[in-house]
């Protein structure tokens, strides 16, 4: 094979082409590999190869490209030196047996009566396999997509028009021609009059009455463009929703050059004004500042001569990334069929062992012999009999015929029909029987981790194998990969998207399950696959969905065939709220008359309560009880009554209870456990949530002994993703939690909303697996009739920054162009905002290609601004803390609190920093210490401090993953070592963490007025969220040391509240949390609403420090290793930022005058000198990466331990020298790595164990 490179070169020479090879280092520091990509002009394919040396990597990439040229008919396989056989064509269908199964039942008899009248019948079957093969090479256009050429032609002109002003309801109006909520609707009406057309708003609503959101949607045909544009926006009332929808339409018309920019004066609603804040800097600090700026060679803006003509202090970018070559065409993710010497699951060539040299024929023969021997096992024969009883078995021949003849097939199957576990096995077994095993590798995506793992384990069981043979899984934090040939990988969509960077190489079939869920990752994957199918028609894509309308998917994929699989095993009878009340004779407990905070409720605009509507068929007691129940709340007592009623039926079977979120699951679990009836041994109550550990999740599948009732309390995770076989009863709250994000005001609305009719149908389908089932919907029939058919797809209600980065990382062309091909494209204004944000962060260069910074951000599974915050944290050697804070944003708070406000036990974790983020950091560090004493010590600590252990463990996993990605990107391990922070005394490292946090959460800045009241951007009113450590217990009027705070999210319920708050100094805002800084000579104006009374030159120097730091970020992301030896000028600049970050520099003392909420004494410090030579705890003096730990001083870098030498060396994973800054001196003790402990081994989780191979290597992805 050594001459394959020369062969390709000679072939290119004849065509006057040149192959271009690009080699880069890959892998981690323990096992260096090289990746080579080869491109040839005129071919939309990238040949890829990797190996432990550059020469073999080049050879492997050349061979991959030659294989591609053979597949597309550019050369013959017999011309190629030692090239393996190509894919064959035939798949023989298998004959199938048909069996009957039960059908639906009649009217709503109560279960105790319907049990006496059980019956079963046959359900009809039908299929639709008509398929019109498209012209796959023709790049078929999806008509919903936008034509963006006019927009991109105008890019530079729009950039010039963009303003940096920050408004409360329109933070980014300047980006969109200055069209705002106030002026857009009038302009849209003018457009309608001129065009003699009319757009109609279609309204829908989500959420219960007390927290309702309205959605306004409009589809408008634009004659000038010859196409439709769509907007879908939400607001707290119809008027606001319609205004937001009109704004989206007008902004899209502007970007498509149909209407002009707004030329009038933008009216700003006057918010409440913020008093100027006096800042006096120490003269010594002023001298240091001036000296630093002088050494950096930065020229400062002169003071204004006229206060009415303020000058900008923003210096812009001092250093730019060099623009990379603009991508000339829309890329397609490369695909190749399974080949010899290639492992698709690790995306690497097989350099060692027999598989490195075996041909496909040899591999196929060996696997067939093994398979034929295996199926003779009596246990396997019994499993085969069970598999044949599944409804999908009757459709095997039809499915295989469609898969063979069509690149795309949709399989629509009822819950529990067996499609998820059986279809991949049908395909694989067909290939094995036909001597083509080595030509088959199947990837199956699932929307959630639990489903990917549980389905993989089920399939492995059915095949009589250990997981990791023909079947494996890969989810975030954990992978068990299957063999390289004739195998199935079950993974989350996020994991597959991460793998796409290496292409879909060596995979014959992609199965996307649960396409109806419409999460943003699945929608993204469908666009990728649609393009891949057109470029490579040989690939096979199977889309699987529940029994919902799939016509949109069918149309999107070129009118592909749909196979409908019927057969819910047993019928399910459903009941509504009035039925449940009548059959249980339920009487609600007296309403809690405790008055709610008026500011929390924000008014009493109650809508119709459907619980007041009850049919005449029901008795007066039922109607009275129903009217006393509020639709706002989930009736836990009624669920309890239903469980007791179910017990009287004496029909064995598990009960699955659907609840909208973890808080209610926890509340319901505690409610039942406190009741002696349910707390006894006759009940087994199990929570099921995506955030609990997998070992806990697995328990829901385990059978229980006779006489015990299993009750599973679950979110919608159990709706479609997993099947629990013994469920007979479903109790459905009919609600779910969704996150609605509005970009123009940076507002997040976490709403518990009514689920859709489709959701309810899926939930009902979870019952009736082992016998006729029962479903109790806790909504009235009147409410059911009002439910939406489907919920809004996630792509319409989430920021697009992360998706945009993925598009650029995968080289798929322009962000807007790619997203316009989505099954339901997001509005153009949302796309432009994502692009603008990424350019502002320096993630995209002037050609809209990824910068080195953008490439790192694209690989971090975190919001891009937080990713950049972590990178700056590495520059200051506080990377670990910022990785912890970023990881914590992915999960709920770890605090368990029955009341709305946090208790003292939780508030104490914030020390005197007035910070939810510091509290999180302190909790995490205290837990990290406690768990070193073993699982019992960890459990005791969490129970004593009322913390959710599962959340803390997941945060640890996420933090380690983020740190691994940064280390793989080249950042020194020393800048990511654990540190101990002092939250009650001076700690300059903690000051820096808070400064960088202000950068990470910008533009979320607020000013404390009184009690719970705060002002956000432009002086708009909001409240401190009740879950904050800063939320007062009563009406006492607190004065914080600084009135300025930054916060993680703005939440809208009936009032707007700020969640995740941290107190900052005005200098930290000036340095990191302001976009527009203006000086009028007397005051410094931050983002047009905060006024600081400070000298012009001092503020200009501080603003210049940020520009200098941004310039350093450019250099560091090009070559992260330079952090080990920074030049003195940058060292001085970083030390100056450390000084500015100190609260005392701004004249702020962290000790409050009055006793803070009566917190009592702070908890005792955990001992720090407990780590040396502790073999029993699995830590000690050895470091995780053989890297020196050292410690860092408060002001200066300090010194680091010898790299790789002897003596006490800290570990990157485990902590290094965990010094504790107190008044300028280092205290504390050594804290070693986790090498021998290996993470959570005693909990069955494994760990990274000091290097990336500790648990199967770094698995890079979601």
Curated annotation (Swiss-Prot):
InterPro entries: DEAD-box_helicase_OB_fold (IPR011709), DEAD/DEAH_box_helicase_dom (IPR011545), DHX9_DEXHc (IPR044447), DHX9_DSRM_1 (IPR044445), DHX9_DSRM_2 (IPR044446), DNA/RNA_helicase_DEAH_CS (IPR002464), dsRBD_dom (IPR014720), HA2_WH (IPR048333). Belongs to the DEAD box helicase family. DEAH subfamily. This is ATP-dependent RNA helicase A protein. Its EC number is 3.6.4.13. Residues 960-1076 are annotated as: OB-fold. DRBM domains cooperate for the binding to nucleic acid but not for unwinding helicase activity. The helicase-associated domain-2 (HA2) region is essential for the duplex RNA unwinding helicase activity. The minimal transactivation region (MTAD) mediates interaction with the RNA polymerase II holoenzyme and stimulates transcriptional activation. The oligonucleotide- or oligosaccharide-binding (OB-fold) and the repeated arginine and glycine-glycine (RGG) regions are dispensable for both RNA-binding and unwinding helicase activities. A motif (Nuclear localization signal (NLS1)) lies at residues 588-597. A motif (Nuclear localization signal (NLS2)) lies at residues 1158-1170. The keyword Zinc-finger does not apply. ATP binds at residues 413-421. It catalyses: ATP + H2O = ADP + phosphate + H(+). The lineage of its organism: Eukaryota, Metazoa, Chordata, Craniata, Vertebrata. Component of the coding region determinant (CRD)-mediated complex. Identified in mRNP granule complexes containing untranslated mRNAs. Associates with the RISC complex. Associates with the SMN complex. Associates with polysomes. It is found in: Nucleus; Nucleus, Nucleoplasm; Nucleus, Nucleolus; Cytoplasm.
């Amino acid at each position: 094979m050594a001459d394959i490179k020369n062969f390709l070169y000679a072939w290119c020479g004849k065509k006057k082409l040149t192959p271009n090879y690009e080699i880069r280092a890959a892998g981690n520091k323990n096992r260096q590999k090289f990746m080579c990509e080869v491109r040839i002009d005129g071919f939309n394919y990238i040949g890829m190869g990797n190996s432990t040396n550059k020469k073999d990597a080049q050879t492997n990439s050349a061979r991959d490209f030659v294989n591609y040229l053979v597949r597309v008919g550019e050369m013959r396989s017999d011309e190629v030196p030692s090239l393996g056989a190509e894919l064959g064509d035939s798949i023989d269908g298998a004959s199938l047996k048909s069996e009957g199964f039960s059908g639906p039942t009649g009217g709503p008899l109560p279960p105790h009566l319907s049990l006496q009248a059980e019956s079963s019948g046959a359900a009809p079957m039908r299929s639709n396999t008509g398929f019109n093969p498209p012209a796959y090479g023709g790049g078929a256009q999806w008509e919903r997509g936008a034509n963006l050429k006019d927009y991109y032609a105008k890019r530079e002109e729009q950039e010039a028009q963009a303003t940096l002003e920050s408004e409360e309801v329109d933070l980014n109006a300047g980006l969109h021609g200055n069209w705002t909520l106030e002026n857009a609707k009038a302009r849209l009406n003018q457009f309608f009059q001129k065009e003699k057309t009319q757009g109609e708003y279609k309204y829908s609503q989500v959420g219960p009455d007390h927290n309702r959101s309205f959605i306004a949607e409009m589809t408008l045909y634009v004659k000038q463009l010859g196409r439709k544009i769509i907007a879908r926006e939400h607001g707290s009332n119809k008027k606001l929703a319609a205004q937001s929808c009109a704004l989206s339409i007008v902004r899209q018309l502007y970007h498509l050059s149909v209407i002009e920019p707004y030329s009038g004066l933008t009216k700003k609603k006057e918010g409440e004004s913020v008093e100027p804040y006096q800042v006096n800097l120490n003269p010594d600090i002023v001298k240091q500042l001036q000296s630093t700026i002088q050494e950096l060679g930065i020229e400062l803006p002169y003071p204004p001569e006229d206060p009415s003509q303020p000058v900008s202090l923003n210096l812009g970018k001092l250093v730019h990334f060099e623009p990379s070559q603009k991508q000339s065409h829309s890329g397609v993710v490369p695909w190749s069929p399974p080949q010899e010497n290639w492992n698709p699951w690790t995306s690497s060539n097989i350099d060692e062992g027999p598989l490195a040299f075996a041909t496909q024929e040899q591999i196929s023969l060996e696997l067939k012999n093994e398979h034929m021997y295996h199926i003779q096992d009596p246990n396997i024969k019994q499993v085969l009999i069970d598999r044949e009883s599944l409804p999908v078995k009757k459709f095997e021949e039809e499915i295989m015929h469609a898969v063979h003849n069509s690149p795309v097939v949709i399989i629509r199957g009822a819950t529990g029909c067996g499609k998820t576990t059986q279809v991949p096995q049908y395909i694989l077994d067909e290939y094995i029987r036909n001597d083509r095993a080595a030509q088959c590798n199947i990837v199956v995506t699932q929307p959630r981790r639990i489903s990917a793992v549980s389905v993989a384990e089920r399939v492995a069981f059915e095949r009589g194998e250990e997981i990791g043979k023909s079947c494996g899984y890969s989810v975030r934090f954990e992978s068990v990969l299957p063999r390289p040939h004739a195998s199935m990988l079950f993974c989350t969509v996020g994991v597959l998207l991460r793998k796409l960077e290496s292409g879909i190489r060596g995979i014959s079939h992609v199965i996307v399950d649960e396409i109806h869920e419409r999460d943003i990752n699945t929608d993204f994957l469908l666009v990728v696959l649609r393009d891949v199918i057109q470029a490579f028609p040989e690939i096979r894509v199977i889309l699987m969905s529940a029994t919902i309308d799939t016509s949109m998917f069918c149309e999107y994929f070129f009118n592909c065939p749909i196979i409908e699989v019927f057969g819910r095993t047993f019928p399910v009878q459903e009941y509504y709220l009035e039925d449940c009340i009548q059959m249980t004779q339920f009487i609600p407990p007296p309403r809690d008359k405790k008055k709610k905070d008026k500011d929390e409720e924000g008014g009493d605009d109650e809508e119709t309560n459907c619980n007041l509507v009850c049919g005449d068929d029901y008795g007066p007691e039922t109607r009275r009880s129903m009217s006393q129940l509020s639709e706002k709340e989930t009736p836990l007592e009624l669920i309890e009554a239903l469980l007791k009623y179910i017990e009287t039926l004496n029909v064995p079977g598990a009960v699955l209870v659907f609840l909208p979120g973890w808080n209610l699951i926890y509340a319901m679990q505690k409610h039942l456990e406190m009741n002696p009836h349910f707390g006894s041994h006759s009940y087994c109550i199990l929570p099921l949530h995506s955030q609990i550990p997998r070992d806990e999740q697995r328990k829901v599948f385990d059978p229980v002994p006779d006489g015990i009732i299993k009750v599973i309390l679950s979110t919608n995770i159990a709706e479609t993703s997993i099947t629990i076989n013994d469920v007979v009863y479903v109790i459905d709250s009919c609600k779910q939690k969704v996150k609605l994000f509005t970009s123009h005001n940076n507002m997040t609305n976490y709403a518990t909303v009514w689920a859709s009719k489709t959701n309810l149908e899926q939930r009902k389908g979870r019952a009736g697996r082992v016998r006729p089932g029962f479903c109790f919907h806790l909504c009235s029939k009147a409410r059911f009739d009002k439910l939406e058919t489907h919920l809004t797809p996630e792509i319409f209600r989430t920021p697009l920054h992360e998706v945009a980065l993925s598009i650029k990382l995968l080289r798929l062309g322009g962000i807007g162009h790619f997203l316009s091909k989505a099954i339901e494209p997001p509005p153009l204004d949302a796309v432009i905002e994502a692009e603008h944000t990424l350019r502002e962060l320096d993630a995209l260069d002037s050609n809209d290609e990824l910068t080195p910074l953008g490439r790192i951000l694209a690989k971090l599974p975190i919001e891009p601004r937080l990713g950049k915050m972590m990178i700056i944290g590495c520059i200051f050697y506080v990377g670990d803390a910022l990785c912890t804070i970023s990881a914590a944003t992915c999960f709920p708070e770890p605090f368990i609190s029955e009341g709305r406000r946090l208790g003292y036990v939780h508030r104490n974790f914030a020390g005197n920093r007035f910070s939810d983020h510091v509290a999180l950091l302190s909790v995490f560090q205290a837990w990290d210490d406690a768990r070193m004493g073993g699982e019992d010590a960890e459990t005791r600590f969490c129970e004593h401090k009322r913390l959710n252990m599962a959340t803390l463990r997941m945060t640890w996993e996420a933090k380690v993953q983020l740190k691994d990605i940064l280390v793989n990107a080249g950042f020194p391990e020393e800048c990511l070592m654990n540190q101990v922070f002092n939250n009650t005394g001076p700690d300059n490292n903690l000051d820096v963490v808070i400064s960088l946090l202000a950068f990470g959460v910008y533009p979320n800045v607020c000013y404390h007025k009184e009690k719970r009241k705060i002002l956000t951007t432009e002086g708009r009113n909001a409240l401190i969220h009740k879950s904050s450590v800063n939320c007062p217990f009563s009406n006492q009027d607190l004065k914080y040391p600084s009135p300025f705070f930054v916060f993680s999210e703005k939440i809208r319920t009936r009032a707007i509240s700020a969640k995740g708050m941290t107190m900052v100094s005005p200098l930290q805002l000036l340095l990191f949390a302001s976009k527009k800084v203006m000086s009028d000579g007397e005051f410094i104006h931050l983002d047009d609403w905060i006024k600081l009374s400070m000298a012009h030159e001092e503020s200009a120097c501080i603003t210049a420090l940020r520009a200098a730091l941004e310039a350093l970020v450019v250099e560091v992301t090009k070559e992260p290793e330079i952090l080990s030896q920074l030049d003195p000028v940058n060292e001085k600049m970083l030390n100056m930022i450390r000084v500015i970050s100190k609260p005392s520099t701004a004249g702020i003392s962290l000790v409050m005058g009055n006793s803070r909420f009566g917190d009592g004494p702070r908890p005792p410090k955990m001992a720090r000198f407990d780590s040396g030579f502790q073999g029993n705890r699995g830590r000690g003096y050895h470091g995780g990466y053989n890297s020196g730990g050292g410690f860092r001083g408060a002001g200066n870098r300090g010194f680091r331990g010898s790299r790789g030498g002897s003596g006490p060396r800290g570990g990157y994973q485990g902590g290094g020298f965990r010094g504790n800054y107190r008044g300028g001196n280092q205290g504390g003790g050594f804290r070693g790595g986790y090498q021998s402990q290996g993470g959570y081994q005693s909990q069955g989780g494994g760990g990274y164990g000091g290097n990336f191979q500790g648990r199967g290597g770094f698995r890079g992805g979601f």
